[in-house]
């Protein structure tokens, strides 16, 4: 049973916001009020449907005492009772605290781990997988920075993904992705194991955090292509070091001005994510063990090419659909991760 007093508080807050916006709130308040109103609206729709179902059930049960209406009530009551548990579950999910970052664009960083050139090739495969997934969702996928490897893989890549639910769905991808397959360079047909690391960060705006200029060291250098050769003769590449944390961000596109923009965009995202992690750790030590914690050192998934199998180790999910997954069909695994995370947060909220 969902506490009715809490539901009524939400409805009253929604009605207050609606009245303020209709009356013409102060310009400085409109954005915050509109955002809260939009967040509460689907919850209020669920509450309204739930209250209507309870009222219908109460009316049907009252009809049992009327001999003329008893048969009709006995027909209606089972269906009404069957609907209510599902509506209560939908309400519980709607009442879960929202992650303020879920509505933001995502910054995606991919780097090869152990495994040499094969790891770089796999990192490139992951980048294409996410690009296809984003395109399938109707999101905008923008490659911010790419350092290719000698054989067509990547030494590192940074992308920005924008669209409804981009960070909310991609955030579960942070961690170590392991691949087991026969590399193209393997003459004897032996299976090799290598890995790549994925970091998914919510994009941060300048208003989210202030970065004093004194905290930054900005260096320029020549851009390098595959194999380390210089791709131009100007010092266009930019490396920004955040001195208090030691975080280093580089960008090596052709325009130095654009490289500064990209590097600052990624640095803001990393610092914002660092603060989010600090607050999450302070709220609950248990939260780190949950699916969406974003621990970049955690091995989250194995892609076994000989068996056509993908296993997500966090939720013990195995799918024999590896070609489709590598082609960008991530919906099933991300939906399973979302459901698992919701269940864990529900259990935490109701404990």
Curated annotation (Swiss-Prot):
Stored PROSITE patterns: RF_PROK_I
InterPro entries for this protein: PCRF (IPR005139), Pep_chain_release_fac_I (IPR000352), Pep_chain_release_fac_I_sf (IPR045853), Prokaryotic/Mito_RF (IPR050057), RF-1 (IPR004373)
Cell location: Cytoplasm
Keywords: Cytoplasm, Methylation, Protein biosynthesis
Modified residues (N5-methylglutamine): 229
Leader sequence residues: none
Keyword Transcription (UniProt): no
A GO molecular-function annotation: translation release factor activity, codon specific
Pfam families reported for this sequence: PCRF, RF-1
Superkingdom of source: Bacteria
Mod. after translation: Methylated by PrmC. Methylation increases the termination efficiency of RF1.
Gene Ontology CC entries for this record: cytoplasm
UniProt similarity note: Belongs to the prokaryotic/mitochondrial release factor family.
PANTHER family (alphabetical): LD18447P
Role played: Peptide chain release factor 1 directs the termination of translation in response to the peptide chain termination codons UAG and UAA.
NCBIfam families the UniProt entry points to: prfA (TIGR00019), PRK00591.1 (NF001859)
Name of the protein this chain belongs to: Peptide chain release factor 1
Organism: Cereibacter sphaeroides (strain KD131 / KCTC 12085) (Rhodobacter sphaeroides)
């Amino acid at each position: 049973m969902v506490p009715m007093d809490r539901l009524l508080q939400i409805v009253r807050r929604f009605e207050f916001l609606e009245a303020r916006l209709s009356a013409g709130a102060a310009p400085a308040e409109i954005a915050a009020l509109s955002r809260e109103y939009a967040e509460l609206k689907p919850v209020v729709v669920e509450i309204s449907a739930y209250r209507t179902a309870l009222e219908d059930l109460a009316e049907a049960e009252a009809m049992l005492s009327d001999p003329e209406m008893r048969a009709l009530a006995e027909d209606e009551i089972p269906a009404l009772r069957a609907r209510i548990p599902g509506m209560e579950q939908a309400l519980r999910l709607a009442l879960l605290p929202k992650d303020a970052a879920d509505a933001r664009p995502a910054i995606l960083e991919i780097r090869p781990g152990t495994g040499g050139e094969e790891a770089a090739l796999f990192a490139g495969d992951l980048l294409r997988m996410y690009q296809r997934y984003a395109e399938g969702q109707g999101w905008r996928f923008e490659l911010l920075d790419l350092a290719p490897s000698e054989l067509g893989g990547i030494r590192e890549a940074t992308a920005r993904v924008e669209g409804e639910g981009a960070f909310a769905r991609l955030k579960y991808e942070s961690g170590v992705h392991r691949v087991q397959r026969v590399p193209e360079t393997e003459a004897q047909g032996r299976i090799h194991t290598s890995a790549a690391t994925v970091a998914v960060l919510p994009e941060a705006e300048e208003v989210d955090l202030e970065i004093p200029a004194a905290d930054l060291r900005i260096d320029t250098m020549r851009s390098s292509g595959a194999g380390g050769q210089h791709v131009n003769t100007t010092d266009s590449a930019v490396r920004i070091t955040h001195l208090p944390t030691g975080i280093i961000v580089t960008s090596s596109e052709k325009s130095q001005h654009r490289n500064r923009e990209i590097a600052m965009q990624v640095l803001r995202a990393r610092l914002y994510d660092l603060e989010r992690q600090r607050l999450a750790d302070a709220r609950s030590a248990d939260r780190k063990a949950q699916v969406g914690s974003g621990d970049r050192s955690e091995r989250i998934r194995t892609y076994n090419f000989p068996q056509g199998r993908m296993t997500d180790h966090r939720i013990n999910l195995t799918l024999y659909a590896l070609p489709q997954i590598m082609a960008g069909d991530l919906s099933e695994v991300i939906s399973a991760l979302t459901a698992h995370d919701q269940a864990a947060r529900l259990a935490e909220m109701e404990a």
